[in-house]
UniProtKB/Swiss-Prot annotation:
Produces ATP from ADP in the presence of a proton gradient across the membrane. The gamma chain is believed to be important in regulating ATPase activity and the flow of protons through the CF(0) complex. One of its GO terms (molecular function) is proton-transporting ATP synthase activity, rotational mechanism. It is a peripheral membrane protein. It comes from Chlorobium limicola (strain DSM 245 / NBRC 103803 / 6330). PANTHER family: ATP SYNTHASE GAMMA CHAIN (PTHR11693), ATP SYNTHASE SUBUNIT GAMMA, MITOCHONDRIAL (PTHR11693:SF22). Keywords: ATP synthesis, Cell inner membrane, Cell membrane, CF(1), Hydrogen ion transport, Ion transport, Membrane, Transport. The keyword Manganese does not apply. This is ATP synthase gamma chain. GO terms for cellular component: plasma membrane; proton-transporting ATP synthase complex. InterPro entries: ATP_synth_F1_ATPase_gsu (IPR035968), ATP_synth_F1_gsu (IPR000131), ATP_synth_F1_gsu_CS (IPR023632).
Length: 291
């Protein structure tokens, strides 16, 4: 049975931890507001660019741009994983890494067995996990979310498109967390390349005049589209991470509060038992002296 001193030490330690988790919750909440704003602001531009590309791709021969042309025989797959740099965010990293593992080892099991699956990992947690297990990592971006910048998204998009054009990848998939709400991020495995015309835009029926020509414009739009999509996914993942961390720290703070309540009850009971024992010993001693 723990002594009064043991219980006091535990109470002190839990109070200290509770202060840390409460502070981390407040920091995550502040970061979430900023991250959520950036993710929401990126959606209209990315969506409109996707719509324009869909309209154009419906009017040109997809063979004019190889990034629009799908390949019948998919032998090589590039998986872009967007995870977090840090932990203490609940099951955020665990869930996204599990999905990436499923995509690599199950969805494309044949390509994986033949060494045809490679990865680009953004975020320290995903990069460290797959590097230690011997997966083929083309590029890694640890600590990318410490100073999130569009240039990284552009570099990832250029690497992916370059590999596709050189035949080093027949399909490019991005695995990330899409931010829907604080309590409900959505795990997604989304095709980035090839750009499918039917998925590129919802409304391709508009009557537009293109200058100089759809083919020239599409060559300009495709790189912008890829960079913008990767950037949007990184912003979505960052917002989902902050939401997960805020929720996890809130839960930890509440758990600490409940544990403190239980320990205080145990401490008071132990203290009361010790006082009762001392009083009983005093009374017994007094009775012995009388006799």
């Amino acid at each position: 049975m723990p002594t009064l001193k043991d219980i006091r030490v535990r109470i002190k330690g839990i109070k200290s931890t509770q202060q840390v988790t409460k502070a981390m919750k407040m920091v995550a909440a502040a970061k979430l507001r900023r991250a959520q704003e950036r993710a929401i602001m990126a959606r209209p531009y990315a969506g409109k660019l996707k719509e324009m590309l869909g309209s154009l791709s419906a009017k040109v021969d997809t063979s004019l741009n190889p990034l629009l042309s799908s390949r019948q025989d998919v032998k090589k797959v590039l998986v872009i994983l967007i995870a977090a740099d840090r932990g203490l965010c609940g099951a955020f990293n665990t869930n996204i890494i599990k999905l990436a593992q499923k995509v690599v080892t199950e969805d494309y099991a044949a390509q994986y067995k033949n060494g045809g699956v490679s990865m680009i990992c953004a975020g320290s947690r995903g990069f460290d996990f797959f590097r230690k297990r011997g997966f083929s990592i083309v590029k890694g971006y640890p600590s990318v979310f410490q100073n999130l910048d569009f240039s990284v998204a552009k570099e990832i998009a250029e690497t992916a498109s370059g590999m596709y054009l050189r035949g080093e990848a027949d399909k490019v998939i991005v695995v990330y967390n899409e931010f829907k709400s604080v309590l409900a991020p959505v795990l997604k495995a989304e095709d980035l390349l090839p750009i499918a015309a039917e998925n590129a835009g919802k409304d391709n029926s508009g009557d537009y005049i293109y200058e100089p020509s759809p083919a020239v414009i599409i060559d300009e739009l495709v790189p912008k589209h890829l960079s913008t999509q990767v950037w949007r996914m990184m912003l979505e993942s960052n917002a989902a991470e902050q939401a997960a961390r805020m929720t996890a720290m809130d839960s930890a703070t509440e758990n600490a509060k409940e544990l403190l309540r239980t320990l205080n009850i145990s401490y008071n009971r132990a203290r009361q038992a010790a006082i009762t024992k001392e009083l009983s010993e005093i009374v017994a001693g007094a009775d012995a002296l009388k006799n």
